[in-house]
Amino acid sequence: MNEIQKYISENESKMLEDLFSLIRIPSISAKPEHHDDMLACAERWAQLLFEAGADEALVMPSKGNPIVFGQKIVDPAAKTVLVYAHYDVMPAEPLELWKSNPFEPEICDGHIWARGADDDKGQSFIQVKAFEYLVKHGMLKNNVKFIFEGEEEIGSPSLEAFCEEHKELLKADIILVSDTSMLGADLPSLTTGLRGLAYWEIEVTGPNRDLHSGHFGGAVANPINVLCGMIAKVVDADGRITVPGFYDDVEEVPQAERDMITHIPFDEEKYKAAISVKELSGEKGYSTLERNSCRPSFDVCGIWGGYTGEGSKTVLPSKATAKVSCRLVPHQDHHKISQMFADYILSIAPDTVQVKVIPMHGGQGYVCPISLPAYQAAEKGFEKAFGKKPLAVRRGGSIPIISTFEQVLGIKTVLMGFGLESNAIHSPNENFPLDIFRKGIEAVVEFHLRY
């Protein structure tokens, strides 16, 4: 057992209790009724940053939820690492699928089970505990700043303006983020790219009230049927998105990268088994790993209308609504795609209904050069903690603010995430393995020593 491992072992009970104090706060940014919880979580984070060794930890106002800023400057001439994280979490529904209370963390089978255990309270806590270790042992050679927001899960609508206003405060050499996943517990990997995102709500309105389906069915357009028909046209039989101009700015995956992807250890049968599906689906001509990381995609995130209560009610509904999204790749502009999609849906809408397409949040994709000294330091950190060199992989998720950091602050980001697909982020029974939590702290400590 090395010194870092010994420190973690001796202090783990206190570490976990502090983490649990954050998790118990239901900081759900998507629900206005949790407004007070957002402030409570921000204040708790500021307190924990002070306790970890920050010289300054502030809860700062933004146009939306408060932002936590902390820092420790050891030498104005030294490099500065800006650690970004988010303290907001996804809603926990459907609650009936949870095996435990999502906001009362439990340890079972070597995992922490709770909403935010991974995304992003657990992962951001790794960063803070690594910082704490370095401060307490007099080993911190970099200046470290922290910026924790409370709106990542709703698209970070306030953070860009905050960054514009506080450019000098946020000045740094590199941004470090733990909010991504690895290929597996025994397959450490560093994320070198993220997809972008565009998100919409589609509202279809037909008659002025719900109608009797016997009296009107077959004569009046059903908004749910119409909505489903329009959505079905967005992706063709080859898995390609049919919106005109959608692929104009899509850069083909370089052959060298495609070759590298084929060498990534990936068991498609295990992948299917983990999510309980018999077969996979996607764009023709691309592998699963290419489809879910390097290529755009379209998904219906939610759809509703009509009667959904117990029993039956034979109605022809007045309204139907869907929330849909596209994952985008670097060079696709989410504003441009958002308008293209809205124009397309309106162009295929029949005159039998009224259709509204409401753009919601979005963000650009991001690629991290593996030649960055900070990337190489992160690579060494993983190698020290996991005993093997991490693979460099693109991931399919989106963190819209990452590209904004580069545009506004002029700083590149290293994505040093420790999540696993089996951690069920955004789903019931989110969890985080304690073994990965410990290794994560060790890896981040090594990053700071190497950078």
Placement of each model-derived feature along the sequence:
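N-terminal helical capping/dimerization or prosegment-like subdomains
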Residues: 2-95, 319, 323, 336
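Acidic, glycine-rich active-site loops and adjacent beta-strand->loop/helix elements
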Residues: 63, 87-89, 111, 147-156, ...
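Active-site metal-coordination/substrate-binding segment of hydrolases
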Residues: 78-148, 439
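Acidic/histidine-rich catalytic neighborhood of metal-dependent amide-processing enzymes
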Residues: 118-193
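An extended, acidic, His-containing surface patch that forms the Zn2+-binding/catalytic region
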Residues: 184-185, 242-319, 330-342, 348, ...
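Flexible glycine/proline-rich, aromatic-decorated loop/lid segments
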Residues: 189-205, 414
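Polar, glycine-rich mid-to-C-terminal structural blocks
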Residues: 207-210, 214-271
